[in-house]
Amino acid sequence: MKLITILFLCSRLLLSLTQESQSEEIDCNDKDLFKAVDAALKKYNSQNQSNNQFVLYRITEATKTVGSDTFYSFKYEIKEGDCPVQSGKTWQDCEYKDAAKAATGECTATVGKRSSTKFSVATQTCQITPAEGPVVTAQYDCLGCVHPISTQSPDLEPILRHGIQYFNNNTQHSSLFMLNEVKRAQRQVVAGLNFRITYSIVQTNCSKENFLFLTPDCKSLWNGDTGECTDNAYIDIQLRIASFSQNCDIYPGKDFVQPPTKICVGCPRDIPTNSPELEETLTHTITKLNAENNATFYFKIDNVKKARVQVVAGKKYFIDFVARETTCSKESNEELTESCETKKLGQSLDCNAEVYVVPWEKKIYPTVNCQPLGMISLMKRPPGFSPFRSSRIGEIKEETTVSPPHTSMAPAQDEERDSGKEQGHTRRHDWGHEKQRKHNLGHGHKHERDQGHGHQRGHGLGHGHEQQHGLGHGHKFKLDDDLEHQGGHVLDHGHKHKHGHGHGKHKNKGKKNGKHNGWKTEHLASSSEDSTTPSAQTQEKTEGPTPIPSLAKPGVTVTFSDFQDSDLIATMMPPISPAPIQSDDDWIPDIQIDPNGLSFNPISDFPDTTSPKCPGRPWKSVSEINPTTQMKESYYFDLTDGLS
């Protein structure tokens, strides 16, 4: 029975030792965190007995540790306020001092929460950047007057050293004190020099019983007593301290709690990736990897990404590393040596290993798992093809053929517009089958009658699609009710731009015409049978380039609701003359653009609106900015600007 009781007590003790405090990042605007910062800032201001109070600017980092007690570890920025310490006001009642005259700082603190309203400062360190302060000049007009000097002046060192020694020898305090910060210094030229120096001191861990004077082993105590001293010293012409007086005020340290300690027996802990204890472990790991790998060449550890160790019945290492293929083959080398260099274009492996080490048996048991990262290779690009362009070869169906290299590609308008936005209605008659038909030869005639009110009539071949021609004869006739033949450009929402001269015009249908749906363009092609139509080709060669049509047709009103971005782009595009039959880039195939590729994926102008937890909101604005006066004039581009 006693044995069972002892085992139960031991298990409970081990369980209590293995409990680890849970730490988590919290919002910098948390209410309890603000109370902890308030306690830390009041603690700091209470130790400053002569200057102005510091006011919170904002909290930059915050972590909450929950265990037997709750602790807040945080960083916060402060600015000097306009309230003196002796004013009796809290820092919340103070305003920021002028930026040119105010000191700033950053503090790191750990505060324990004892109850819902009680917060105790465990540790705190503040780095204060003083303001410019009074101007220090090399010469004054007033001879013999008291003038401020820099607190970093080397002339102050012997006086400060003497002052600290004088304080430690003439006080009843059990510990030695050391210099903390020089706050102000003044000097007066007489028959020698008069100095008046104000500085702060702090208690150290060196007691007077064990140390007669300060040594490098003496360190300041955060929970120790602090003080502020003002020394008056006279240095004669022999640079000796002829007279010295000192006035010091001591402020006892209070309300100190020890920071939380984390005890986790057997928990994994991180170790440096270049730790010497990993050398033997990594050697056995790469040996195990090469023994299990069937590759022709040896692999070598390129870099260690992360390493952890856990104390068990021995030690267990968890290592993440990258292995690279070397130039040493397994056939010509019995083992991996230091002279084996990694291949520049070799294969890489992303590996994680668990290595169990039993020191008293001098045994190591490694287990390695690797995933290939791929092989580095060089790819040839066609000349002029941008490396940043994302593309893929279009899928070739039975009904389509690859376009010849000399065929140029012209953009096509989208014919599937919303008919509700037009002034009139659009009628379309189609004959054919369900699939789109593509012809290498044939005569496709498109007849359109503009009635002046947006009524449009189109005849084509194919079910829902216009007939596509390679190098056939494409005749387009444009007839007005007034029988007036105009080479114009009708801007009507829902139909394509028509370029015409007089009664009709033979156009090269070998240019890729497609239906523009989103960003997808269907490529059509010509057949080798186009040699059977010499008359059409001869007529096309003798015809001059098509002139750029005017933007607006006389007598036709253009409404902005019918105006599209593509209308402006297509209108301003110059005519594309037929490319030469033979070209140096004939071997470059037509590449279908990936609509989801990088070149067509617009990058967002603004980041995501998810607001981070830290840093928090400023306590008070340093300077109020009027958004109505600070906003710059923005220029909004309207497509109507293209009409002017």
Curated annotation (Swiss-Prot):
Pfam hit, one:
Cystatin
Query: Could you tell me what this protein is called?
Result: Kininogen-1
- Looking at the record's lineage, which domain of life comes first? Eukaryota
Cysteine pairs bridged by disulfides in the record? 28-614, 83-94, 107-126, 142-145, 206-218, 229-248, 264-267, 328-340, 351-370
InterPro entries cross-referenced by the UniProt entry: Cystatin_dom (IPR000010), Cystatin_sf (IPR046350), Kininogen (IPR002395), Kininogen-type_cystatin_dom (IPR027358), Kininogen_Fetuin_HRG (IPR050735), Prot_inh_cystat_CS (IPR018073)
Clinical condition linked: High molecular weight kininogen deficiency: Autosomal recessive coagulation defect. Patients with HWMK deficiency do not have a hemorrhagic tendency, but they exhibit abnormal surface-mediated activation of fibrinolysis.
According to its UniProt record, where is this protein located?
Secreted, Extracellular space
Annotated positions of the 4-hydroxyproline modification = 383
Q: Where is this region: Disordered?
A: 387-555
Ranges of compositional bias, category Basic and acidic residues: 418-434, 477-493
Q: Which UniProt keywords apply?
A: Blood coagulation, Disease variant, Disulfide bond, Glycoprotein, Hemostasis, Hydroxylation, Inflammatory response, Phosphoprotein, Protease inhibitor, Pyrrolidone carboxylic acid, Repeat, Secreted, Signal, Thiol protease inhibitor, Vasoactive, Vasodilator
Q: What does this protein do?
A: Kininogens are inhibitors of thiol proteases. HMW-kininogen plays an important role in blood coagulation by helping to position optimally prekallikrein and factor XI next to factor XII; HMW-kininogen inhibits the thrombin- and plasmin-induced aggregation of thrombocytes. LMW-kininogen inhibits the aggregation of thrombocytes. LMW-kininogen is in contrast to HMW-kininogen not involved in blood clotting.
Sites of Phosphoserine modification: 332
State whether it acts alone or in a complex, and with which partners, per the record: Interacts (high molecular weight kininogen) (via amino acids 402-532) with triafestin-1 and triafestin-2, anticoagulant proteins from Triatoma infestans. Interacts (high molecular weight kininogen) (via amino acids 402-532) with short form salivary protein D7R1, an anticoagulant protein from Anopheles stephensi. Interacts (high molecular weight kininogen) (via amino acids 421-466 and 459-513) with haemaphysalin, an anticoagulant protein from Haemaphysalis longicornis.
Comp. bias (Basic residues): 435-446, 494-518
Q: Which residues carry this modification: Pyrrolidone carboxylic acid?
A: 19
**What tissues has this protein been observed in?**
Secreted in plasma. T-kinin is detected in malignant ovarian, colon and breast carcinomas, but not in benign tumors.
Modification after translation: Bradykinin is released from kininogen by plasma kallikrein.
Start-end of each sequence repeat = 420-449, 450-479, 480-510
Native organism: Homo sapiens
Q: Which SUPFAM superfamilies match?
A: Cystatin/monellin
Q: Which GO terms describe its cellular component?
A: blood microparticle; collagen-containing extracellular matrix; endoplasmic reticulum lumen; extracellular exosome; extracellular region; extracellular space; plasma membrane; platelet alpha granule lumen
Q: Which residues form the signal peptide?
A: 1-18
| Gene3D superfamilies xrefs | 3.10.450.10
The feature of type site (Not glycosylated) is located at: 48
Task: Give glycosylation sites per the record.
Answer: 48, 169, 205, 294, 401, 533, 542, 546, 557, 571, 577, 628
